[in-house]
Amino acid sequence: MRKAIPRASRLRPTKEVSVMAWIEDAASSVLLVRQAAGLKLWTLPGGKVKKGESLVKALKREVREETGLRIQVGSLLGVLDRRDKDAITLLFAAIPSQASNKAKRKQNEIKKATFQSSLPNKASPSAKYFWSARRSPVKKAPKIRASTHQLPTALL
């Protein structure tokens, strides 16, 4: 019989968890947002998961805040473990759930939101990683396959 781990000894996640959305339009262009402050990098819409918030709710909130779009969240497409930042980013497929697929900026953190057919040079490390994994031949980056399995309810 296994002994329960004493409450004070239980593991607590130490990594910051972020979520990002891979949203394509009919022409297979991908929705990118440009940061308004700092290095003003292009990145995929998304952000940090708040304490007690599900991954799906966090992604819906972040995309809505940054672009004005309401989305339906699909499969997990990839994971980026940023050991240098003690952070992990999860990439999900998503589609706009409203009739219009035009992105509108709702937050002052984002300067611009637009569908792009290629990744701009001034892109965030996570955007470069996921773009390369989704769009490049296998020799440049490991291919990320969309999961056919649903995430455990505890993660949602």
Residue ranges and their predicted role:
Residues 1-20:
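Acidic, metal-coordinating catalytic segment for phosphate/diphosphate chemistry
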Residues 39-42, 108-156:
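Nudix hydrolase/Nudix homology domain
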Residues 15, 40, 72, 86-88:
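Residue-level preference for beta-strand/loop junctions
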Residues 23-24, 32, 94, 115:
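Conserved hydrophobic "DFG−1" position in protein kinase catalytic cores
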Residues 70-78:
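A short coil-to-beta-strand element that immediately follows conserved catalytic motifs
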Residues 80-102, 114, 129, 133, ...:
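Active-site-adjacent beta-strand/loop module that shapes the phosphate/pyrophosphate-binding cleft
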Residues 25-65, 69:
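Conserved Nudix-box catalytic region and its N-terminal flanking loop in Nudix hydrolases
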